[in-house]
Amino acid sequence: MAEGFALTESTYYILLSLVRARHGYGIMQQTEEMSNGRVRLAAGTLYGALSGLCEKGWIVQLPVEADSRRKEYKLTEKGMQVLRREVDRLKELAENGEKILREG
């Protein structure tokens, strides 16, 4: 992730939900819950995003049992680094905002 690059809110919540392995529907539910309903992912949108995140090496699809139709995904170490940088960036934004508001 290049310095100064911000994740979209959807990508942020998808990555955050994949700290623990989840299948697509679980990702949609967790994302909606964590965002207090602000981020609602349609299946097509989610699977397009998952494909792109796999290509970047930020997440990986886990092996599935032969009879399972559910695909599970999990954050990679690279994805964890991206997520940590984004959390740090968001903290800095909030701290700067609070500082300016306090100073009036």
Language-model segment annotations:
Residues 1-6, 86, 90:
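Intrinsically disordered, low-complexity serine/threonine- and proline-rich regulatory segments
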Residues 2-45:
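N-terminal helix-turn-helix DNA-binding core of bacterial DNA-binding proteins
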Residues 16, 29, 51, 84, ...:
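A cross-family signal for key residues in well-ordered alpha-helices
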Residues 46-47, 53:
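Basic amphipathic alpha-helical segments that dock to polyanions
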Residues 54-69, 74:
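Beta-hairpin "wing" of winged helix-turn-helix
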Residues 84-104:
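Amphipathic alpha-helical dimerization/coiled-coil segments
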